[in-house]
Amino acid sequence: MTKANKIFKELDLFIYMLLLCYMLVDCMTGFLRIKGLPGVSQPYKMLLMLLMILSLKSYIGTVIYFFFFGIISINLIFYFFYSYTSFSDSLAMLLRIVMAPILFIYLKKQNEKEPKRFLNIIKFNTSVLFINLLLGLLGFGGSTYENESALGIKGFFYDGNALAATLFAIYVLWINLAPKNKVIISIVFLFFGFLIGTKVSVFSVLLYFILWCFFNVSKRKRFFVLFILILCISVLVYVLLQTPIFQYQIERIKWLLKLFKGNYVSVLLSGRNLDLNAHYEFYKTNFSIKEFLFGFGFLNFRKIIELDFFDTFFSYGLIFFLGIFGFYCYCLYINRKNKKITIFNLLYFALSITSGHIWFNSQVALFFSLANIIFLDRGKKINETHFASYKHVSFKIKSDLRYFCKTNL
């Protein structure tokens, strides 16, 4: 092994260690913010991005990285001179949205070299997620809805909406990876989705489970299975609607109907369509080729729309939007033969159009990327048993850490 190859191998090992701590760092950031201290998530992820870029020895990957960071640099130069743009927020959100393509490019390369590490990353981060939510159940951390009702649990994670999307992506990984007990896995994730208490955390898991079952049985039995599932889930939803958190959601819907004068679109989107109209009016008033191509950043006098699809276009312009949109279309294309992952990608895309903290969510980026990589066989043939041989793999954190310390300290 050459000296250069040894350095790259140790660098990949260090990145692997950082990825094992992915959710733990977000959890620490939430804890620090509750205490009024600055978080550690942003510098950690900036370091992770830099190391992944340095580690990648791929011409195509380098071109893609150059494209994203070239556009980001041009955007930031313009935003610096805009009086109506928050430069720091624009930079922070840019780094969040490019996390998914950077992770995807790096992990796709690692899938050819060290795919067994992926399962350890999923296991460890899932454990952190569950332990955190259980601690929230015991009264530690914050609530999903920080008001007088204090309903929902998010533990020490800072953003309930981002946490809901992350739970959904991790659920998709486990239901497709686990060799058995898929119904039990679904019940466990539904339980934790209920603890979080958002529409996304509960209904994304429910809807995916219904569609997963529908496509997992023979065509002859599909509609019978669908009927049974809808019947069981209707009973479950009825029970859920009697709980305080969903009673709160019902009262909130009634309040929104009154606020928006019976406009069901506004109620469904929690008024985000009105924010979309306001941003569109500002866009029309200040339109120029420069804003069309590079956007106007995150406005310092108006909150974001929280519809990621539209926020990306208005904030960062057509060129950057096409890059991000192209990435998600590529993920959909390469997994087109795998109906279960295609369903996930379509639901994920639908969430980005109807809600926020999906594309602009660096927390879920890792698990979205893994879901779109681990079921591929060289990008052509779907191999659904790709992880069957890994079910007995134990954690090698201790031996990996010993090797890293021995060679570097």
Annotate each language-model stretch with its function.
Residues 262-303, 319-320:
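TM-adjacent membrane-interface loops and short helices in multi-pass inner/ER membrane proteins
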Residues 1-253, 284-290, 302-409:
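Hydrophobic transmembrane helix bundles of membrane-integrated enzymes that assemble
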Residues 246-266, 295:
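Flexible internal linker/loop segments at domain or repeat junctions
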